[in-house]
């Protein structure tokens, strides 16, 4: 965990998050993968019919290391449904337990505007593309413990079909829960590309949604690429894990650091750091948010030479 997460672990202070900021991000987000004949992508915008915009919806989470980003994302989606006049959650986090064993868990069962009962699976992921990568397997998690291809296969081949199996249908009947008639997936997040060409790198024909949200990544030995250039000032914010979803939306009164402080802070940290970059051309101007990226400890050999 990053420095702010480590400090939270040491203090043991509960983590307070305004989920409205995460929901605002979600409503602007895109699926990581394109829809297929077997996978119907859930569109958060279709469920959002709030007549007034709320600015605050604070949830409290346990301190690190008990805090979980996935739980925060589930609560964000639940907040979306609570704001909807057309979509209603019937049940969430349904553990399928038989006499013999636990078969799995359904994230959400909801009813949509057409009175359909839908099984919805959720996942938010942040993957970076390895050097010279061209396949889904080359998108890996910031700590190297996860891969996009494995997650995609797990969701398609196991999680989504689960609600169509006889044991699960029987379990839902026993619990007096409606049987889903269709399945949807909300797999969103950000894909990060090597900083040098992060905006222009295109990986086609592997099923990615071409409109997915993207960012950059680099390793400690490459941080000089972030130096301000003549006529352009840069400032940065290092995000705690609980601000990874909403990003800049959480930074109402941002406490920015300059390039030197960024280098000092991130190179002392062996864990991945998510960073927001801000720019301005003149000192009397306000800094404008430009993009976000991941800074990683240099691996041997480096991911990028």
Question: Each PLM stretch: what is its role?
Answer:
Residues 1-305:
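Intrinsically disordered, low-complexity Ser/Thr/Pro/Gly-rich regulatory segments
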């Amino acid at each position: 965990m990053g420095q702010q997460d480590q400090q939270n672990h040491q203090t043991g202070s509960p983590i307070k998050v305004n989920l409205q900021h995460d929901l605002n991000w979600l409503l602007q987000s895109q699926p990581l993968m394109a829809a297929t004949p077997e996978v119907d992508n859930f569109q958060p915008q279709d469920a959002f019919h709030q007549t007034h915009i709320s600015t605050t919806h604070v949830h409290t989470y346990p301190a690190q290391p008990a805090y979980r980003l996935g739980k925060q994302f589930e609560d964000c989606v639940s907040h979306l449904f609570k704001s909807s006049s057309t979509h209603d959650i019937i049940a969430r986090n349904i553990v399928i337990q038989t006499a013999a064993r636990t078969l799995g868990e359904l994230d959400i069962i909801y009813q949509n505007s057409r009175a359909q009962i839908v099984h919805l699976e959720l996942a938010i992921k942040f993957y970076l593309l390895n050097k010279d990568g061209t396949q889904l397997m080359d998108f890996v998690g910031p700590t190297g413990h996860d891969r996009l291809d494995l997650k995609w296969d797990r969701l398609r081949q196991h999680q989504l079909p689960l609600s169509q199996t006889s044991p699960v249908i029987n379990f839902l009947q026993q619990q007096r829960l409606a049987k889903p008639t269709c399945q949807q997936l909300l797999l969103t997040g950000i894909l990060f590309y090597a900083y040098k060409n992060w905006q222009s790198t295109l990986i086609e024909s592997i099923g990615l949604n071409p409109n997915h949200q993207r960012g950059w990544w680099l390793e400690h030995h490459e941080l000089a690429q972030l130096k301000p250039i003549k006529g352009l000032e840069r400032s940065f914010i290092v995000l705690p894990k609980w601000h990874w979803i909403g990003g800049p939306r959480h930074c109402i009164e941002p406490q920015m650091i300059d390039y030197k402080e960024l280098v000092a802070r991130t190179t002392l940290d062996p864990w991945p750091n998510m960073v927001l970059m801000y720019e301005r051309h003149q000192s009397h101007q306000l800094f404008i948010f430009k993009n976000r990226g991941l800074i990683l400890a240099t691996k041997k050999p480096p991911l990028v030479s």
